[in-house]
Amino acid sequence: MLRKCVGCGKIEDREKFVKITRDAHSNVFVNPNSKIFGRSVYLCYNKSCVEAAFKKNKIQKALKAPIPDELKGKLLNEF
């Protein structure tokens, strides 16, 4: 299935992205194996896409929920 990166707009197969999900209780987390359902966004596995998505609040807008600071730090340090 094709998905779009919220950082750069690149369209690829969903296995090439990291998935960030908001569940029914407004908890936001990285969902690597797609086992949890909810509103989701996808990011490329590179630091520039992560930075672009956070700079313009694209993740927060797409998930309609605030992003925890520890998740921001985790994603920025991971790439």
Question: What do these predicted ranges mean?
Answer:
Residues 2-5, 41, 46:
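Residues immediately within or flanking Cys/His clusters that coordinate Zn2+
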Residues 9, 45-50:
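Cys/His-coordinated zinc-binding microdomains
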Residues 13-16, 49, 54:
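Short functional micro-motifs and their immediate structural scaffolds
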Residues 13-31:
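Short recognition patches in nucleic-acid-associated and regulatory proteins
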Residues 34-36:
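Conserved catalytic network of the ASCE P-loop NTPase/AAA+ motor domain
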Residues 51-79:
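C-terminal structural segments of small proteins and small subunits
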